[in-house]
């Protein structure tokens, strides 16, 4: 903190800088000085380290040298992009005063703040990925979460029921910035997020949030958006909107509504499931060999982003899914893929261009790309109208007629404008008569100067005479030193060079003033006309946004049709029974990376067969089989066709996976602890409509502990939850479960062993695996034969000396299951036991005793 005394010791310019810096102490300040952005003090040191730019010193202020770093204004976007990628925020300070009239430092002010979550510049954004900012609020054990996509205006809120649901939502949306209240006390749920920003409690005040939101949407209340009964979500949304306004320093007209995300509307995927299924990110953190990498061949960036949102948020509305399916079928039946995609490709990223139009930050080439996008709509509409597919026709009903706006941009802009309006040459000839006049005057200078040069050369007889221009001295007549003595008396010397003299004459000076005025006037008028284009487009922003959303959806549907045709996918059907029946299903990703043909496999889960115990060798394909079942189910619930011969799928509310685990070193949790935490979440959250994948539960502890836990988990899922479950295990003892419990069946993935080698068949068969292939897999992995031989000897010895054979262990578990059936009844009898213990028969009348007996009978069903 700089004291008043120290502040006064600084130069006026540095005082101005320090005042602006004090407004934004926690972020970098880019301070405009002429053609450069400069950073000072700690900002300079930090920027020099992050951007690999030179750290210098700028004289002294208050008796101390000033650390300084900077970059040219025309190169700032590249530096901003790097800083944003590193999670930094930057305040942009511009000169708004006129240097020629300013007394003291030129007036400056912060015009915008660039943060990772509020950027809209094309160069700063990942093209095919949403760039979201979120805010989270907490009251007791409940949460409110709001998200905003500044590049589209999409504004949503939800109220996660608990911290696990909050963690899953944050994993889904992956915000690049997260605002949280200073009183937030569940940091473990958000500590994995990028760009954490602590905000004061008053920014989450509910009444302020409602007022702010109503003012933004021009409404009296929020009932039309269906969010009025979500106070925690609204508190988060209010903070988020206020932050967006603070950083942008302008109106946000593209944020026109807010919607509520209802958990019951979507299939819930927890963080572990998203990770294990490798939807958009693989286990190594990359994007290769993910579901999105196979499925996403969209021709527009906005379509690609929409598809990823569908993948991460499968919907349960079967009617909506059937509409998507029928649209895909129409595209295939009418052979529309090749017809529609070339036009869609030219639509480009209309969604983000419109956001920049709303923020009035769109550059000339943004507007020409918008023009190109609007030019494609009639052609796309004509193709659809010619074939009249009902679902696609309904989709096109959301796209208005933009011929007027398209004509405006065609008349106003040249074909290929320069990057920035400051360079001029953006507005087309014929659009504005006054601009054409100014341009004619300035553009006519070349011919006039050629004529003047010819005339002066002839009148003076000086053959080296020529007319030129530079930014410092303006127009001049140049004569070589050898002929300078011939210069007429009315030539006024302007500059002496080593080999020439430069002069000015009244006529040339007068023309210079006229030309410079015309160029300045033309540029000023061009900027004014450019700004007026925003005024003419903004009244149509809402309908343009609806059109961009419809075109995004069309791109996704055409893409899914192309994928279905290319990859041999089929349309799944939906049914009312909780079930999954897939004939010859394939893993959508693995089949694309395998050199050999993929072995397709069936799966059938229903009320009478709701848990499959899967055995077989490691590397035999158990994990692939389970994942493909989940991915096929997920694909069905985004409306896509699926990799199978047929698929019939019933209602699913959640997908859980407990597949693979490793130590969580950062949190100090072992593999076993990670495994048990994920398993506990499944046992608490799963329902009879959940699809549950369990792979090798019980590792990382003693054999008997692991076996007991695996058996108990399988039994609980089968008896108490009755979810649709695939339960892969290396405990052969669990294959006895079907004999003990209804609804459980054994399946296995087979392998063939011959002469110490093993061949994996990858084909699912009914029944349990005949044996374990652990030693054969170890040999395949390259374990020395001497070690394998020793292991076989030890295995024989252990089996011989074991106090329990495998059959005896299974029998013991059967008896334990029979004798301890009450364990699963304990929770239900706790209340009954407590009621009886509190009962005092001597205090009851006969009528009260009879009533109490009926109550106890009701408790036991």
Swiss-Prot record:
GO BP annotation list: mismatch repair
GO molecular function, one term: ATP binding
GO cellular component: cytosol
Transmembrane regions listed in the UniProt entry: none
SMART domains for this protein: MUTSac, MUTSd
Keyword Secreted assigned: no
Pfam families (UniProt xref): MutS_I, MutS_II, MutS_III, MutS_IV, MutS_V
Chain residues that bind ATP: 616-623
Superkingdom, taxonomy of origin: Bacteria
Keywords annotated in UniProt: ATP-binding, DNA damage, DNA repair, DNA-binding, Nucleotide-binding
Family, per entry: Belongs to the DNA mismatch repair MutS family.
Function: This protein is involved in the repair of mismatches in DNA. It is possible that it carries out the mismatch recognition step. This protein has a weak ATPase activity.
Protein name: DNA mismatch repair protein MutS
Organism: Haemophilus influenzae (strain ATCC 51907 / DSM 11121 / KW20 / Rd)
């Amino acid at each position: 903190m700089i004291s008043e005394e120290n502040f006064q010791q600084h130069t006026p310019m540095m005082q101005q800088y320090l005042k602006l810096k004090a407004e934004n102490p926690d972020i970098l300040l880019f301070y405009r000085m002429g053609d450069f952005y400069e950073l000072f003090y700690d900002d300079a040191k930090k920027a020099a380290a992050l951007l690999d730019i030179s750290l210098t010193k700028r004289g002294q202020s208050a008796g101390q040298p000033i650390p300084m770093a900077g970059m040219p204004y025309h190169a700032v976007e590249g530096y901003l992009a790097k800083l944003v990628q590193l999670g930094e925020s930057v305040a942009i300070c511009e000169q708004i005063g006129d240097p020629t009239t300013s007394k003291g430092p030129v007036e400056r002010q912060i015009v915008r703040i660039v943060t990772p979550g509020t950027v809209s510049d094309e160069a700063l954004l990942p093209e095919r990925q949403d760039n979201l900012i979120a805010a989270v609020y907490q009251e007791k054990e409940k949460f409110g979460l709001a998200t905003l996509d500044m590049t589209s205006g999409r504004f949503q809120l939800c109220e996660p029921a608990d911290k696990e649901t909050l963690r899953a939502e944050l994993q889904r949306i992956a915000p690049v910035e997260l605002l949280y209240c200073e009183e937030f006390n569940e940091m473990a749920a958000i500590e994995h997020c990028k760009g954490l920003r602590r905000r004061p409690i008053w920014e989450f005040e509910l009444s302020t949030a409602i007022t702010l939101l109503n003012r933004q949407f021009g409404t009296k209340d929020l009932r039309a958006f269906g969010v009025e009964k979500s106070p925690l979500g609204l508190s988060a949304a209010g903070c988020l909107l206020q932050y967006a306004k603070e950083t942008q320093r302008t109106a946000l007209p593209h944020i026109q509504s807010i919607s509520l995300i209802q958990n019951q509307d979507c299939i819930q995927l927890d963080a572990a499931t998203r990770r294990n299924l490798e939807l958009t990110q693989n286990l190594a953190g990359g994007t290769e060999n993910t579901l999105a990498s196979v499925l996403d061949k969209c021709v527009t960036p906005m379509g690609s982003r929409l598809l990823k949102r569908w993948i991460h948020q499968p919907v349960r509305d079967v009617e909506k899914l059937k509409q998507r399916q029928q649209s895909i079928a129409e595209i295939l039946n009418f052979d529309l893929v090749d017809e529609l995609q070339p036009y869609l490709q030219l639509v480009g990223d209309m969604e983000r261009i419109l956001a920049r139009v709303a923020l009035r930050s769109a550059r000339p080439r943004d507007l020409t790309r918008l023009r190109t996008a609007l030019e494609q709509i009639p052609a796309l509409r004509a193709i659809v109208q010619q074939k009249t597919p009902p679902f696609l026709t309904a989709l096109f009903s959301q796209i208005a007629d933009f011929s007027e706006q398209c004509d405006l941009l065609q008349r106003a802009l040249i074909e290929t404008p320069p990057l920035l309006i400051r360079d001029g040459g953006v507005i087309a000839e014929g659009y504005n008569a006054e601009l054409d006049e100014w341009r004619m005057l300035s553009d006519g200078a070349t011919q006039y100067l050629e004529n003047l040069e010819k005339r002066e050369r002839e009148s003076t007889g000086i053959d080296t005479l020529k007319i030129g221009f530079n930014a410092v001295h303006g127009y001049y007549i140049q004569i070589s030193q050898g002929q300078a003595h011939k210069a007429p008396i009315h030539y006024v010397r302007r500059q002496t060079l080593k080999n020439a003299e430069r002069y000015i004459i009244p006529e040339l000076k007068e023309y210079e003033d006229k030309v410079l005025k015309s160029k300045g006037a033309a540029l000023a008028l061009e900027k004014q006309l450019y700004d007026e284009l925003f005024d003419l487009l903004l009244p149509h922003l809402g309908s343009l946004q609806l059109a961009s959303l419809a075109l995004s959806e069309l791109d996704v549907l055409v893409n899914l049709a192309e994928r279905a045709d290319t990859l041999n996918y089929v349309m799944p059907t939906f049914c009312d029974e909780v079930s999954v029946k897939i004939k010859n299903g394939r893993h959508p990703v693995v089949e694309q990376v395998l050199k050999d043909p993929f072995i397709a496999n069936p799966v059938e889960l229903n009320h009478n067969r709701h848990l499959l115990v899967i055995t077989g060798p490691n590397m035999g394909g158990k994990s692939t089989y389970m994942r493909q079942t989940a991915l096929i189910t997920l694909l069905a619930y985004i409306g896509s066709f699926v990799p199978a011969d047929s698929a019939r799928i019933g209602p699913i509310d959640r997908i859980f996976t407990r597949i693979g685990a490793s130590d969580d070193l950062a949190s100090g949790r072992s593999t076993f602890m990670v495994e048990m935490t994920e398993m506990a979440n499944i046992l608490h959250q799963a329902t009879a409509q959940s699809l549950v994948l369990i792979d090798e539960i019980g590792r990382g502890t003693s054999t008997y502990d692991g076996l007991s836990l695996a058996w108990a988990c399988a039994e609980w899922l089968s008896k108490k939850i009755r979810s649709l479950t695939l339960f892969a295990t290396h405990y052969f003892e669990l294959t006895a479960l079907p004999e003990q419990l209804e609804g459980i069946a054994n399946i296995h993935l087979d392998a063939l062993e011959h002469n110490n080698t093993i061949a994996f068949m990858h084909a699912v068969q009914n029944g349990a695996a005949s044996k374990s292939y652990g030693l054969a897999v170890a040999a395949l992995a390259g374990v020395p034969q001497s070690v394998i031989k020793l292991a076989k000897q030890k295995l024989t010895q252990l089996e011989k000396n074991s106090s329990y054979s495998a059959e005896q262990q299974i029998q013991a578990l059967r008896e334990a299951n029979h004798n301890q059936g009450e364990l699963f009844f304990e929770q239900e009898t706790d209340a009954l036991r407590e009621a009886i213990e509190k009962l005092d028969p001597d205090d009851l009348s006969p009528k009260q005793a009879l009533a109490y007996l009926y109550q106890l009978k009701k408790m036991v069903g």
